């Protein structure tokens, strides 16, 4: 077992590379980057950002156990609209591609919210329907 920390634990505006280095400096053996709408780890980015982060992690001796994403708060897999669900499905595919390029063994997918939305404006689904 080892200690790992998520990218969201760091100040907003820090990129994944800076967070990885800060995690190492703080004594963490692992770092969980976040897949986002924009940036080097995003659906639009391709593999280059993931490969660069993997290379940095390897050179620094930091493990990358998984890849998180908060994109499902705005684009839930449990959305009522088929078009909205298709967007979420495309995000899952892109996140899996990024995870493969990073060499991580797991991704975080929050398929939707029930009851009250966690994120402002996120669509909530009845528990029985989720």
Predicted features and spans:
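Glycine-rich, proline-tolerant flexible connector loops at the mouths of alpha/beta enzymes
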Residues: 32-58, 111-119
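Aromatic-lined carbohydrate-binding surfaces of glycoside hydrolases
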Residues: 71-74
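Short polar catalytic/cofactor-binding loops
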Residues: 7-14
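Active-site acidic/histidine proton-transfer and metal-coordination neighborhood
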Residues: 17, 58-60, 76-130
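A short, structure-level motif marking secondary-structure boundaries and short turns
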Residues: 3-6, 37-40, 79-82, 120
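Short, solvent-exposed polar/charged micro-motifs at secondary-structure junctions
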Residues: 13, 43, 76-77
């Amino acid at each position: 077992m080892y200690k790992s920390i998520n990218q969201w634990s760091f100040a907003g505006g820090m990129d994944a590379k800076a967070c990885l280095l800060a995690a190492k400096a703080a004594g963490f053996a692992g770092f969980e980057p976040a897949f986002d709408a924009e940036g080097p780890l995003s659906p639009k980015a391709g593999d280059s950002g993931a490969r660069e982060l993997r290379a940095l992690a390897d050179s620094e001796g930091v493990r990358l156990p998984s890849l998180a994403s908060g994109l499902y708060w705005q684009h839930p897999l449990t959305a009522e609209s088929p078009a909205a669900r298709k967007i979420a499905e495309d995000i899952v595919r892109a996140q899996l591609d990024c995870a493969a390029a990073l060499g991580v063994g797991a991704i975080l997918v929050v398929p939707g919210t029930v009851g009250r939305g966690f994120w402002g404006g996120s669509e909530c689904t009845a528990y029985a329907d989720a």
